[in-house]
UniProtKB/Swiss-Prot annotation:
The gene is gnrh3. The keyword Zinc does not apply. This is Progonadoliberin-3. Brain; ventromedial olfactory bulbs and terminal nerve ganglion. Residues 57-90 are annotated as: Disordered.
Length: 90
């Protein structure tokens, strides 16, 4: 009985490992949320031999045009974040 339950557990673990190993290739090149970047999509379409670039839906093209603006770091010379000395200098 113990040998058969051990065999069942080993088969289940093997099935899980095989499933994870075979499904890893699907996640390559995808962004969080299951979205692909536009450049990769165009490259994929060209590789498929369609001969042209497929126009993107209006929602997707609006997202690609909107870029985050860089922020400016302002150094006001404050020493607020400097560590306090534990021992006075003698």
């Amino acid at each position: 009985m113990e040998a058969s339950s051990r065999l069942v557990v080993q088969v289940l673990v093997l099935m899980l490992v095989v499933q994870v190993a075979l499904s890893q290739h699907w996640s390559y090149g995808w962004l969080p949320g299951g979205k692909r970047s536009v450049g990769e999509l165009e490259a994929t379409i060209r590789m498929m031999g369609t001969g042209g670039v497929v126009s993107l839906p209006e929602e997707a093209s609006a997202q690609t045009q909107e870029r985050p603006r860089p922020y400016n770091v302002i150094d006001d010379g404050s020493r607020h974040f400097h560590r306090k000395k534990r021992f006075p200098d003698n």
